[in-house]
Design a protein with these regions (language model features):
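ATP-dependent carboxylate activation and anion-phosphoryl transfer catalytic cores
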Residues: 2-10, 15-18, 38, 153, ...
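ATP-grasp fold ATP-binding core
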Residues: 152-153, 182-200, 223-232, 236
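Rossmann-like NAD(P)H-binding beta-loop-alpha module
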Residues: 154-193
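Hydrophobic beta-strand scaffold residues
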Residues: 43, 130-131, 159, 189, ...
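Glycine-rich beta-alpha junction loops
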Residues: 49-52, 169, 195-197, 231-234, ...
Length: 366
């Protein structure tokens, strides 16, 4: 049950969520639960089911990962109060009582829609509770690949050729959309839901029939589709932390087990490999680092993010792919591996992220 500790900072790890990345979130959150320094922090865990129910739980990381946390007898329905006077949670106990719990900081370990897209961040801003990671605007912009690509273009950050189309545009003139995409991008074409992460719903199309099928899959995951020209290059990723200034790590490289870095590659079959630092010349590693900090700053990121790039094999051009404002923290995830390579183990990283969250709130209200 909840303790009355006064000397420890109360930290909520918020996990699960209603997105297609629910399972990944549960595993990522387990890392925070296991690595949080219990001598310094009072841990509170709140799970969000796929149906959107918020439950206070005392589940351990294994129960979170396998999904059994939802059935634990000690779970209690809860809400995060937007009332700044509450500054925390409201629990509904089995005895029918209402219990208020003060919260000092929230770690929203929520990947994808309804968590990484500015929605939960907006709730936390209303509540006046410090939280780890990017703010409302950066979270929303980076979640939408079309908006992020437009921002990259406006900021002069090199990106592969791209187009986007809404469901209405596609359904109104499907052949016209396909013609326009093929004419601008050529083959091959990556087709992506605008608002999805972890490679969910992404297809590489090699011909018109595959393009049509890829569009149908993307529309099953979102109402807007992004089309990007294929890049034959190294897939590299930088971890970025802080703001004013943002600090980026040396990039790591993904050696994908398929034609591209799929959801299964990332989280299931384990055939992909990670190489740190990336297999690139030193000056190219520095160039990627520079672009990572530029992109992070241009899109208003704070706290942490992972910036993903392609480095073309023929030309050496560095092209940004996307920014993930709440990168994975699973045992195979790149962000914590990159930080560990810089000499920052996960417990120290969590301490730093919490400190950054508190610093931001102090600057806003100080």
């Amino acid at each position: 049950m909840l303790s009355d500790s006064e000397h420890k900072m109360s930290v909520v790890v918020l996990f699960g969520g209603m997105s297609s990345e629910h399972e990944v979130s549960r595993v990522s959150a387990g890392t925070f639960v296991d690595q949080l320094d219990r001598q310094r922090y009072e841990l509170l865990t709140i799970g969000i089911t796929k149906e959107g129910r918020w439950l206070y739980t005392e589940a351990d990381s294994a129960q979170m990962a396998d999904g059994s946390w939802e059935e634990l007898p000690g779970n209690m329905p809860c809400v995060l109060s937007p009332d700044r006077a509450d500054h925390g949670l409201i629990l509904f106990t089995p005895a029918g009582q209402v219990e208020k719990v003060h919260v000092d900081v929230v770690i929203p370990v929520l990947h994808g829609l309804w968590g990484e897209d500015g929605t939960v961040q907006g709730l936390l801003e209303l509540a006046g509770i410090p939280y780890v990671g990017c703010g409302v605007l950066a979270s929303a912009v980076c979640m939408d690949k079309a908006v992020a690509n437009a921002m990259f273009d406006a900021s002069g950050i090199p990106h592969t050729k791209w187009l986007s189309a809404t469901r209405w545009e596609i359904e109104s003139d499907p052949d016209g959309v396909c013609d326009g995409v093929i004419a601008k991008l050529g083959w091959h074409i990556f087709v992506k839901p605008a608002n999805a992460g972890s490679s969910v719903g992404i297809t590489k199309a090699h011909d018109r029939d595959e393009l049509k099928a890829a569009i149908r899959l993307a529309l099953a995951n979102d109402r807007k589709v992004v089309f990007e020209a294929f890049v034959d290059g190294h897939e590299v990723e930088c971890a970025v932390i802080g703001s004013d200034p943002a600090v980026s790590t040396r990039p790591g490289e993904i050696l994908a087990g398929a034609e591209f870095y799929t959801y299964d590659d990332k989280y299931k079959n384990g055939v992909s490999q990670v190489v740190i630092p990336a297999r690139l010349p030193e000056e190219k590693l520095d160039e990627v680092k520079t672009y990572a900090a530029m992109a992070y700053t241009a899109l208003g990121c704070e706290g942490l993010a992972r910036c993903d790039f392609f480095v073309e094999k023929d030309t050496g051009r560095v092209l940004i792919n996307e920014i993930n404002t709440l990168p994975g923290f699973t045992p195979i995830s790149m962000y914590p591996k990159l930080m560990e390579h810089e000499g920052i183990p996960v417990p120290a990283l969590i301490d730093r992220l919490i400190a950054l969250a508190l610093e931001r709130t102090e600057k806003q209200h100080g």
